Amino acid sequence: MIVADSECRAELKDYLRFAPGGVGDSGPGEEQRESRARRGPRGPSAFIPVEEVLREGAESLEQHLGLEALMSSGRVDNLAVVMGLHPDYFTSFWRLHYLLLHTDGPLASSWRHYIAIMAAARHQCSYLVGSHMAEFLQTGGDPEWLLGLHRAPEKLRKLSEINKLLAHRPWLITKEHIQALLKTGEHTWSLAELIQALVLLTHCHSLSSFVFGCGILPEGDADGSPAPQAPTPPSEQSSPPSRDPLNNSGGFESARDVEALMERMQQLQESLLRDEGTSQEEMESRFELEKSESLLVTPSADILEPSPHPDMLCFVEDPTFGYEDFTRRGAQAPPTFRAQDYTWEDHGYSLIQRLYPEGGQLLDEKFQAAYSLTYNTIAMHSGVDTSVLRRAIWNYIHCVFGIRYDDYDYGEVNQLLERNLKVYIKTVACYPEKTTRRMYNLFWRHFRHSEKVHVNLLLLEARMQAALLYALRAITRYMT
C-alpha cells in the first residue's frame, strides 16, 4: 500500500509536482498542463480538488515515511494519499492494516487477500477487489480461485454467510453462526483463524465505506495517464465538478450554518458542565425516536441502484441481501444492543487480546485515534472544542446499527447533525456503493475537505467497531 524507499519518494514527488508550489522538477510544461486540464481533475479523489488532497496528503505521507520504511514494499496508492490528510490517524491505521495482511498469522497471506476480496465484493468496491486480487497472486494464490467462490476451497466458502451478515446486518449474527464454522469436521476453522478472518472482514467492509465516501479513484498508469473514472450515477452526469466548499456559491448561507452549529455545540457543552440531567426513561425515548427517524434518512429516490459487475458477483453469494433498517415499520425488530451490556473496552477488547493479542492493542489504538482526533477547528474557526460533534457522529453511526448508549442523550444528534449529513453518514455506513458526489457536496458546505475526510474516518472506525461488537458477542456466547 505504501513504500518508503527511493521509488516511493519519487512517486510522492510525482504526486506533489501537480499541486501548486510542488516539489521536484519545475513541473509539467504548459502543453502537459493544458492536456490535464482538458481531461479534468486527475487526483486521488473524484470529490476533492486535486490541489488540496495531493498537496496536504502527499506531504503528510512523505513526512511519515520513517515508520513505513520498516513495514512495507508496496506503492503509494490513492487511498493512502487521501487518508494522509490525517497522518496521526494514518499511522494507527497502517499498523493494523499491515498486521492483518502482511505479518505472520494463523492464516496464509494469500487466504487473507482472498478474504479481503470476498469482503470488498459485498459492496462492489472494485478499487479494493482489484488491489487484493493483484496481491493474492503476488503471494502465491491459485489463479483458479479468482474465477469465483465456486473455485475456492470449501473452508473459505463457509465464510460467505458471516461475511454477508457482517457487511449488511451484523445484528443477526448468533453463536450458531460461530458454532457452524468451528464445529469439528473436514473444513473446520480454528478459533485463532476465525478471529483473524472476522477482523479482516470488518476491516475491509469499513474500508469500502471510506473508498466510496471519499470518492477514491483507481491509480493512473505510471506515466501519469488517467485511470478509469469511478462510475457516475445517471442523476449526476450533468453535475459540475466538485468545488472547494470554502468558495461555493452558497457561502453566506453556509457560513451562517456554521455559526449556528457552533452555538448549539457551545450550549450543549455548557449544559453538560451544569450537569442538567435527563431521566433514563427520557434518554431511552430519545434513542428510540432517533432510531425510528433514521428510517426516513435515505438517499434520494432518483439515485439508481448500482449494477453489480460480473467480475465481483462471482465472489458473492446471495447478492440481493443488503442492509435493512434496524427498526422497520410493521416488522419485529431485534432487541437493541445496549452498549453497556457488551462494551468494546470491557468485553470486546479483552476477548480480542486473549485470542488475537497482536491485533487487540492495534485495534484499540486505531479506534481511539479516530474518536479523539481533533485540530480544534471548524471550517474557518479555530480554538473550538469539537468533542460533542464527534461523539454525535460516532453514536449516530452506532444507532443505525442498533447500538444504544444508556448515558448518551440522543437529542444531541438532532441538534448537531443536519439532514444532509445524516443522509451521507447512513449511506456511506450502510450501503456505501450508493454514495454520490452530490451527497458529499451537500453536507457541511462551508467546511474544509480534510474535515469531510475526518467524518469518513469516524465512519470507518464506528462501523467496524459496531460489526465487531456483534461478532465478538456471538463468540462470547458460544464460549460460555
Swiss-Prot record:
Mutagenesis or variant effect for G411A: No effect on the ability to inhibit the TORC1 signaling pathway
EC number(s) recorded for this UniProt protein: 1.11.1.-
Record's comment on post-translational modification: Phosphorylated by ULK1 at multiple sites.
Biological processes per GO annotation: cellular oxidant detoxification; cellular response to amino acid starvation; cellular response to amino acid stimulus; cellular response to glucose starvation; cellular response to L-leucine; cellular response to leucine starvation; cellular response to oxidative stress; D-glucose import
N-terminal domain as annotated region, ranges: 66-239
Result of altering C125S: Decreased alkylhydroperoxide reductase activity and loss of the ability to decrease intracellular reactive oxygen species. No effect on interaction with the GATOR2 complex. No effect on inhibition of TOR signaling
Region (C-terminal domain) location: 308-480
PANTHER family attached to this UniProt entry: P53 REGULATED PA26 NUCLEAR PROTEIN SESTRIN, SESTRIN-2
Name of this protein: Sestrin-2
Gene designation per UniProt: SESN2
